[in-house]
Curated annotation (Swiss-Prot):
Keyword terms: Ribonucleoprotein, Ribosomal protein, RNA-binding, rRNA-binding
NCBIfam families xrefs: S20
One Pfam family linked to the record: Ribosomal_S20p
Gene this protein is translated from: rpsT
Superkingdom of origin: Bacteria
Name this polypeptide is given: Small ribosomal subunit protein bS20
Disulfide cysteine pairs (residue numbers): none
Family per record: Belongs to the bacterial ribosomal protein bS20 family.
Protein purpose: Binds directly to 16S ribosomal RNA.
Annotated spans, Disordered: 1-25
A cellular-component GO term for this protein: small ribosomal subunit
Organism: Dinoroseobacter shibae (strain DSM 16493 / NCIMB 14021 / DFL 12)
Comp. bias intervals (Basic and acidic residues): 12-22
Length: 88
C-alpha cells in the first residue's frame, strides 16, 4: 500500500495510464486483426489498404511506449510479406 503522498499520487497516475495504454493496445490489435481478416479472405487490395492503415497505428504505439520499435517492425515486416504474397 502506498503510504507517502507521492506514492499515492503515482498509484493514481499508474491506474489512469494503464487505462489509456489498454485502449491504445486494443486499437492496435483491432487494426492488425483487420489486416489478418483481409489476408484470410484472399482480397489483396483490401489487405493492402488495411496494412496501410495499420502501419501508422503500430508506429504510434512505438511512440507512445506501448510497443518496442523492433516488435512493431517485425509485425509490419511479417504482415507486408504475407500481403505481398497474396498479390503475387
Amino acid at each position: 500500500m502506498a503510504n507517502s503522498p507521492q506514492a499515492k499520487k503515482r498509484a493514481r497516475q499508474n491506474e489512469r495510464r494503464a487505462e489509456v495504454n489498454k485502449a491504445r493496445r486494443s486499437r492496435i490489435r483491432t487494426f492488425l486483426r483487420k489486416v489478418e481478416e483481409a489476408i484470410a479472405s484472399g482480397d489483396s487490395s483490401a489487405a493492402a489498404d488495411a496494412l496501410r492503415s495499420a502501419q501508422p497505428e503500430l508506429m504510434r504505439g512505438v511512440t507512445k511506449g506501448i510497443l518496442h520499435k523492433n516488435t512493431a517492425s517485425r509485425k509490419m515486416s511479417r504482415l507486408s510479406k504475407r500481403v505481398k504474397a497474396l498479390s503475387a
